[in-house]
């Protein structure tokens, strides 16, 4: 926003700057939401409907940037991926393989899901579904631990407690684990979902 006229500014900003926030990974959700809504009201295209075309265009671009910034920064995983991007990094193919710490869990759950898909007897299906519900709890616990590790990594970045290269490696590892656990939870939930009655 222009400090003089209150109009939108079309300058290229990073997503933190778009919301007027410092580049920090630990973000208070209420503050993020408040900034998003306050800035959104100030640069909303309706406020500039009678303005010059360049001002209208800047308002539209500013609103789009603001919305993208909010969506990315409110989700810790998206924020972590964006942080990697800001640091010239991304998850490589190595980080997209099953993390060794999760290999046994992923294998066991996928095996149980395959058995459930192939089960033809209702009692076998019910028994397998019960076992998979238990596995879901185990996967959710692993997800909670990974999210805690992500929060700790964010705090280390913000406090400058470790060397950036080691923090990037740790961040990549944690984001990779979360990606696998999200996929596993999605697969479990999909298989446990009751069949649709619409036909």
Predicted features along the sequence, with ranges:
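C-terminal accessory/regulatory regions appended to core domains
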Residues: 1-199
């Amino acid at each position: 926003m222009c400090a003089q006229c209150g109009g939108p500014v079309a300058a290229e900003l990073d997503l933190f700057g778009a919301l007027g926030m410092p580049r920090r990974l630990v973000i208070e959700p209420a503050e993020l939401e408040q900034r998003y809504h306050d800035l959104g009201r100030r640069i909303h295209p309706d406020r500039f409907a009678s303005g010059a075309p360049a001002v209208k265009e800047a308002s539209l671009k500013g609103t789009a940037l603001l919305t993208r910034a909010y969506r990315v920064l409110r989700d810790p995983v998206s924020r972590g991926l964006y942080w990697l991007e800001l640091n010239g990094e991304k998850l490589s193919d190595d980080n997209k393989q099953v993390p060794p710490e999760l290999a046994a869990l992923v294998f066991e759950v996928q095996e149980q899901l395959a058995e459930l898909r192939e089960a033809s007897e209702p009692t076998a299906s019910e028994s397998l579904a019960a076992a998979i519900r238990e596995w879901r709890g185990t996967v959710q616990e692993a997800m909670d631990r990974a999210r805690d590790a992500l929060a700790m990594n964010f705090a280390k970045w913000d406090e400058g407690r470790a060397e950036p290269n080691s923090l990037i490696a740790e961040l990549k590892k944690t984001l990779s684990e979360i990606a696998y656990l999200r996929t596993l939870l999605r697969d479990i939930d999909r298989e446990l979902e009751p069949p649709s009655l619409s036909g």
